[in-house]
Amino acid sequence: MNKLFVGSEIGQLRRVILHRPERALSHLTPTNCHNLLFDDVLSVEKALLEHDQFVKTLENQGVDVLLLQDLLEQTLENPEAKEWLLKHQISHYRFGPTFANQIRSFLLEHSNKELASILLGGLAFIELPFKAPSMLQQLSDPFDFVIDPLPNHLFTRDTSCWIYGGVSINPMAKAARKRESNHLRAIYRWHPLFSNQDFARYFEDENRYYDNATIEGGDVLVIGKGNVLVGISERTTPQGIENLAKQLFRTHQAKQVIAIKLPEDRSCMHLDTVMTHMDHNVFSVYPRVIDKNMGCWSITPCGEQHLDIKEMPNFQNVLMSALELDNLNIITTGGDSYEAEREQWHDANNVLTIKPGVVVAYERNTYTNEKYDKAGIHVLPITGDELGRGRGGARCMSCPIERDGI
């Protein structure tokens, strides 16, 4: 088996990509945070301490943690990768011909470590040491960004997701996140950990306009036994799911994709904010969104080129059939109606399973964590008072690249 393989949501987690977004978070302000898809400004120092605790918790469980900025820095050691990234981020059409050339020359003066930090964390006009014959530069406020920060890279789950023996480099729904995909394309194409490995790649063409076919990894659950569960959400479209399904079937990486319809609401922007897999038959669920009667479709291959798409009447039955189970143990968000809504908002259902029955979760969600404990789920608590304000929990902040099947 290729070691770059994610066979389930609950098998032993062996290797994962995280991101510690120091520079990007320091560029968040009350003025720009909403454009950058954050609801609020985080305390950088506290958020980084919480992220360090998350890393340590995983490492204490034997998980190999790779940091995105380190991977990008190492990728930039390859001249072809550096040229490719700068070409796609600093174009004449974005900045004008003279200004683009001068920005590119300025960036090339930096070390790979500094360049990786800038690409991920942003660059303001005031940081440029030159004045170009550029109307764009002359018209811009000094504190506007030449290169926008990417604080959402914190949520490494979304930009790329490994599905059995392949990786989907996702066409993101929001403009503020589209640049993230090219960082992962470069890493998977040129970083030594990946460049000599044989694995399927989906949505890899950086020159293709994917139009309405968007998909984000928070909506993708690799539930095992050749099945993939995907949420139709505000970020993931039916077109994106069908295109992903076709590529998975073409490369023989899945036998069925199950799609379920979510409300288009920020509180449940991805499937994993309302449902995660914790043990063989155990799921964490926010019951106001996930129920057996929700819209559900089974997608299977139909010959070499087509899909068979069937609407299914009972989501829970579809899930049990896919996983070859006789029953499901559904743990709903804890507390009364008010407490459950508050805890779902703070990612009580967004847990990262380390191995069957062992999960990482925010400690603040006491009512839900108590229900997990009573159901026999061992919770490894982490602080998320700041990180959680970005609207993502432990699963959102992790991209497994090596995990056992079931």
Curated annotation (Swiss-Prot):
Report the EC number(s), separated by commas if there are several: 3.5.3.6
Q: What cellular-component terms does GO give this entry?
A: cytoplasm
An annotated Gene Ontology molecular function: arginine deiminase activity
Record carries keyword Hydrolase: yes
Q: Quick one: which pathway?
A: Amino-acid degradation; L-arginine degradation via ADI pathway; carbamoyl phosphate from L-arginine: step 1/2
Q: What is its main location?
A: cytoplasm
Q: Where in the cell is it found?
A: Cytoplasm
Superkingdom: Bacteria
Broadest EC class? hydrolase
Please name the Pfam families in this protein's record.
Answer: ADI
One GO BP annotation is: arginine catabolic process to ornithine
Q: Which SUPFAM superfamilies match?
A: Pentein
Query: Active site: which residues?
Result: C396 (amidino-cysteine intermediate)
Q: Does the keyword Nuclease apply?
A: no
| Reactions catalysed according to its record | L-arginine + H2O = L-citrulline + NH4(+)
Keyword terms, alphabetized: Arginine metabolism, Cytoplasm, Hydrolase
NCBIfam families noted in UniProt = arcA, PRK01388.1
- Please report which protein family the annotation says this sequence is part of: Belongs to the arginine deiminase family.
* UniProt protein name: Arginine deiminase
Lineage, top ranks: Bacteria, Pseudomonadati, Pseudomonadota, Gammaproteobacteria, Vibrionales
